[in-house]
Amino acid sequence: MREILFKAKRVDNGEWIEGYYAECKGKTFIGIDISIGIDVFEVFCTPVIRWLEVDPETLCQFAGMTDKNGKRIWESDVVWLVYNGEEHIYQIVWDNSELDFKATNGEENYGSNFEYLLCCDEIEVIGNIFDNPELLQEEHK
């Protein structure tokens, strides 16, 4: 079972943060567990969460996989992958009809199940559509 995590850019400084997702009074928040290393947490096992407002347009869910370098793969990431000896640059998207993540270049998809990406020879996160939209253009050159 994959860990349910989200990331988004903070409203106050544009920094990417990872954690838990919530909406309250029309605003979007990511909660960061700041209890690690606190003695009270070790005794009572009660996490201390700091909630930070984020830009909802940048909200991305963890896809449950890591790339060849151990980096988490998120919705809206741009990945470089090798399949059957051919290199591709794809975007990770959520597919509502399949209720799963896909890697797509807008023209074709790699399977209806995100786990099919495990058959790729290599997969590496090289950016995301918010910070590096130009990466998707490279596939079509």
Model-derived features: positions:
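Secondary-structure transition motif
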Residues: 1-141
